[in-house]
Amino acid sequence: MYIHEKQLIQAGKLAAHAKKAVVLLHGRGSSASGILSLSHHLQLDDALLLAPQATNNSWYPYSFLAPVANNQPALDSALGLVGEAEAKAAQLGVAPNALYFVGFSQGACLVLEYVGRNAKPYGGVIAFTGGLIGESLTLSNYTGDFGGTPILITSGDNDPHVPLYRIEESASVLRGLGAKVTLEIYPGKPHSISPDETLLANKVVLS
């Protein structure tokens, strides 16, 4: 088991010239620099980019469907890193309604878990193949009010890592917290991010 070293890559616009800030969370086996390359396919030219790096390139050791205790202390440490990225954006003068979150796979799960536990009117959330974390969901963990925050969740209909039932369950929980959730499921899509998904993210969340 492990906790995360504090590593945060800052890229994109300087805070003084940015219209928004975006926290990007990489998937298992990837890196902060890898997820930053996704910014070239999203409408983020006006954004300050903040990308935490997971120790061992993994936010938590087991499946996101494992009992939460099995993924500790790495999971709580990872959530803390996301919180520090949000605090960094605030320190640089970015209001919550100009703060966005983007994640893929394990990073998408972490994004949804973080915002679900800290719901407020954010700028928007993009989860490419992800769902809320845990063997079963502890609904009391998810508090606050998104105030209509747009949240996009995309996935394939038979993803090998993120089952559709958990994606749908997660969308329901987030809607209950006041988010405007768009759920897009692609038949036969592999475990990756497709051009259709980035186009939809630009339209639904970033436009």
Predicted regions and their residues:
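C-terminal catalytic histidine-bearing segment of alpha/beta-hydrolase fold enzymes
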Residues: 28, 168-175, 179-207
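Short alpha-helix in the alpha/beta-hydrolase fold that links the catalytic acid
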Residues: 35-38, 139, 163-173
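Active-site signature of alpha/beta-hydrolase-fold catalytic machinery across serine-
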Residues: 37, 113-117
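Short beta-strand/loop motif that positions the catalytic acidic residue
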Residues: 152-155, 159
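Serine-hydrolase catalytic machinery in alpha/beta-hydrolase-like enzymes
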Residues: 2-97
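A conserved short beta-strand
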Residues: 120-133
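Gly/Ala-rich beta-loop-alpha elbow adjacent to hydrolase catalytic centers
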Residues: 102-107, 111
